[in-house]
């Protein structure tokens, strides 16, 4: 178990020149080798990146999964400078990463959430904030270039509504579709299966020549290195909720499962 980690390089392979013993590194674990809840992990160099100097190990451990999710979403969209993106529910931990990364891509960022979080996301760079308790974004916004969906199926139709003709929606919690299966190189049977489960949203997108993508984040050291540069330039401060010892792993997992975390919940392995 464990999707991401920060730590120190203890050994390197014979053909590794990019990293040295003692380097501070972080990583989104490869999908076939999830296992960050451990004292040591053997990881392909192509999944690793060096930690920005200003981040502690604890802060760095918060970064890879959510930051890569945001980065890969914008990469999939092929975003262009000065265009508008709506990030649904952008006041959470993903938004805290996605907003400054979106600004680094030159995007104009709109998000919604609770009014108590308005100032915090404005400080992150949001250009327009919508209080979901008093305003319905689907009645306010239109002709949006991109939507990053973090809420899932119950919001997707409203998100398509605000998207311009030929706009692009990337969902992190919707249904995978055939395009996702093809992009991920999945089996023929999964292409058929995902083609069925994602058909509803493909059809909605086709009405206005829009594009619907489902994203499941992959390990990518080169992209994570770009994230490191963005963090270094902007001095982004990851949000930590609580740090547990490895012996408290069940307590930590329960907290996350119950949705009680207001930032990242970490395990510290001594």
What does each model-found stretch correspond to?
Residues 1-34:
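Glycine-rich beta-strand-centered segment in the early N-terminal region that forms part
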Residues 28-89:
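NAD(P)H dinucleotide-binding glycine-rich loop of Rossmann-like/cofactor-binding domains
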Residues 64-134:
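Mid-domain Rossmann-like dinucleotide-binding core that forms the NAD(H)/NADP(H) cofactor-binding site
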Residues 154-233, 269:
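Glycine-rich phosphate-binding loop and adjacent beta-alpha segment
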Residues 217-270:
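C-terminal hydrophobic helical "lid"/dimerization subdomain
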